[in-house]
Amino acid sequence: MKTIDQRLEALRDVMRSEHLSAFIFPSTDAHNSEYVAPHWQSREWISGFNGSAGTAVVTLTGAALWTDSRYFLAAEQQLAGTEYELMKLKVAGTPTVSEWIAQQCEAGSEVGIDGTVSSFAETEALKAELRQQGGMTLRLNFDPLTRIWDNRPPIPQHKIELHPLEYAGETTASKLERIRESLRQNHCDGMLISALDDIAWTLNLRGTDVHCNPVFVAYLLMEHEKTILFVDKDKITTEVSAYLSALSIKILPYNEVGKYLKRDYFAYNIMLDSHETSSYLVACAKAGRASVVLKTSPIPAMKAIKNKTEIEGFHNAMKRDGVAMVRFLKWLIPAVEEGNETEMSLDKKLTDLRKEQPLYRGLSFDTIVGYEHHGAIVHYEANEATDIAIKPHGLVLIDSGAQYQDGTTDITRTIALGPITELQKRIYTLVLKGHIQLEMARFPDGISGTQLDVLAREPLWRAGYNYLHGTGHGVGSYLNVHEGPQQIRMEYMPAPLHSGMTVTDEPGLYLADRFGVRIENTLLITADCETEFGKFLRMESLTLCPIDTKPIIISMLSDEDINWLNHYHAKVYETLSSELNGEEREWLRQATRPIEREKA
């Protein structure tokens, strides 16, 4: 196996032969996915960094990697010993990709990026920036790794399965008609869907092509009278074939989508989402003389609002997940006191308990178990090299979730394993206050998550602290654990919040090399009231699991905070207790007992 330095040397040989001064490796695949199958993990292969977000850039004399605050510490560790320089996004003084390339390369240089895995919006922005940074040009039609990546994993070929109506809540025919109505409103004749979760949702199908994401690799072309699924036929079972045939959906090979788009259309308007569609496929559509209409896909907004069946599924999935979490938390402290547990063993125990639950289909992301200083690595993942023993003191941060056939879960709990410091208690309480403030929010229908973000941060800001990751994201219904368009974060996000959306509430605080705290519930946005000022919304927790009360400094909580926590814990006990045995029920009763101020 080649080392990172050997891979860089081989890449530079290819770059010289192609007269390229720099090459850019994004994190995405041909579908602009956040999490990608091994075939498309080019950035990881060339850099060694395995986080879900980041961009590697290699010039003939240097190499750099950009990533966000979730991965700063992990990236420092993974890039150590290589020539890569870590570029911290949103940190003052960090150059942009194009600025750094301009520092490294001569004016007029040619820069490469694989246009099959780079969205049209991204490449157009890069072209403009590189022109501005010294008249550099961007080449899109070349992937150097085809020459140097030996034994590259193939595009996955796992079987596709039906997602029954009893869990989907809406027929595929109904979804197709809703999408076609959007095409009519936008005066378009067709639409190419690239996003894998959008395709899975539209067709009520699921797959296992991407780790932890129940999707399959395909494209979907919709026209007013015709629907074509571009997918390798080996993935289609007899059952799925009959299902698609009944919907009059034609199947063509996955690798023929570009060829199909190049057909000589006449007076054909095709809708493409510039943020989801690769530059290569946009070029194919233009080569076919179609009139390309660049618009945001209507599907994410449709998918984001869960129907009654999906909401019921979330409640049921969260209940089963809560049972697994309670059993894990009951086991945790005694097991740690015995002295044989590590971060990896905690991960395995929690996964094993989830596997016992009905309709379990796998994890929704790789579990994060960060003990003490590892808790400060926002997206830490223990492995044989980093795994450490868990001691009966300090804090452990556990961020985990599962895929059930009727819903997807995402939960974080930070647990005191024994004595902790006053600073740890103070920060834990500040994070909890922010979590509560956001979950108690009442707000007008249609505002953006940006307008709510301050509620989760305000207690930390007041104390001079902050976290740099987002506060909340949408969650799919047996789909991707990160789902848009709704988000709660500091950066402006125009997507409006509406009843029926899911969103997480996950403020945190991380002190490098010391500890981290994060508390996360998955919430459902619901109608609250309607006044002369319009419709108002509120949020209710779908997650059912005790929040550790041991680290709380009660004097820092308001009466409203205390009432919220006690009400939440009463709900957790009432909902889960009947699913537990006697010992588990007693443990839960103690874990959810009301907190109160000390009497004077």
Regions found by a protein language model. Name each.
Residues 1-600:
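Active-site neighborhoods and metal-handling regions in enzymes and metal-associated proteins
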